[in-house]
Amino acid sequence: MSLDAIVIGSGIGGLTAAAMLARYGMRVLVCESHAIAGGAAHSFQRRGFTFDSGPSFYCGLGKQRPSLNPLRQVLDVLGESLQVVPYDPMGHYHFPDGTFPVYSNAERYREAVARITPEGAKELERFEKRLLPLYEALRDVPTIALRADWQLIPVLVGRYLPSLLKMLPHLGIIQGSVGDVMDKEVRDPWVRRLIDLECFLLSGLKAHGTIAPEVAFMLGERTRAGVEYPVGGSGAIVDALVRGLKRWGGELRLNAHVEQILVEAGKAVGVRLRNGDVLKAPIVISNATIWDTYGGTHSRAPLLRKEDLPQSYRESALKTPAVDSFMHLHLGIRAERLEGLTGHHVVVHNASQDITEPGNTCMISIPSVWDANLAPEGHHVVHAYTLEPFEGWQRDEAYEQRKKERSQPLFRALERVIPDIRQRLVLELIGTPLSHSYYLRRYQGTYGPAIAAGKAMFPGCQTPLPGLYRVGDSTMPGIGVPAVAASGILCANTLVMPQQTSELLVNLGKN
């Protein structure tokens, strides 16, 4: 089979890049090590329960046009769509001193804050007014039009000059942190804690480590488009991308573990699979993390040999700091007398501890409140997770006991929402950093790079090795579903002529 491109990994970044290239007419093969596509966004089933393995919070996936969500833009390009369920409030934050409802409607959100701290609500409004003009400027430049090389400049100047001019007053915060804006506008400690928490939920870092455009986009999109859950769970998103890939002639191969990226005469020329198969293509795109692509782990060799990259580049890349891994609970519970249950919750156990402390901040998703088909009749499906360091975890005789112990903060968090949850259990699955690393093939099971705003930038899709490109959460623009979809768009568009992208935009009516 003659191929134009091989994509390693079927996370959302990899599937997006592959499907876009197929849409452009390339012959593309995606090699996925796992038996299920989707990477951190895959769904899995146990005893009639359908679980999201990772993300469950989405906005801008529905029918509103135009959508600013890069993932929705890709689905439009592919001719695919999703059935979604809108909801509000979008969640509840449970602090030691009380529970706070979080609304996507900006006015209701500020009203809820004002009931706790009237002055803080005014400061929050000033904070949002500093960020939302950045969103208004960015919204006029669809991600689907962008690329990651010098040819972006004539595209921006030729098609989006008015939008660029709108950004000029905000240049100071585009590469700045949310913390910089917060320090200027917000003194109230409760609101500062709220902003830190929302940044942490987005990026894995607090306000001073999170770039301002990321939060501007979040604030704008959840207000404009609202929040939605895809019917069928996160796996429905993966299925739509796979359908789009195949619709345009691409191929997905499961249980196809890539052992090595092949390099000849200083160029990436293909891959070798664990079963010995050799596949050749002039373009290789790695959806593996920066550490797994360049450095490997104690149990997995890197995709590239040391000598395939400049030493200084490789060493610098492997010094990229990583966010911790996770403890997970995937539970099936009886649903009687839970009629008023809502779907998203965040529990902070100790206000005097840092919210990034493992076990202190726990995220909870109960998606069967929106899609009853995810659980057997009369039951709910529950996913809870919290940060957990990889260090010290090993599959020894103490492993099962340690799993039980380290999952207790998650159970205590769930008891804030469903006090008798332990008595409702019909299925209990505990995931550890080792689970995260094994199933997702991720270095130390990490959430992604801990690249703080103002300290460094996420690298682009290009690498020093001709023919090799990267997508996913260790490339620009970073962590999160919209971001990794954007990384796939940027990579795919960079590999075709600008005219091809322009024709795509004309066909979509986005020009």
Task: Give residue ranges: language-model regions.
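Rossmann-like flavin
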Residues: 96-209
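Helix-loop-beta segment of a Rossmann-like dinucleotide-binding subdomain
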Residues: 155-169, 206-242
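A glycine-rich dinucleotide-binding beta-alpha-beta segment and adjacent secondary-structure elements
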Residues: 188-203, 356-363, 419-477
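Helical element adjacent to the flavin cofactor pocket in flavoenzyme catalytic cores
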Residues: 218-272
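Mid-domain catalytic core of redox enzymes
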Residues: 259-376, 511
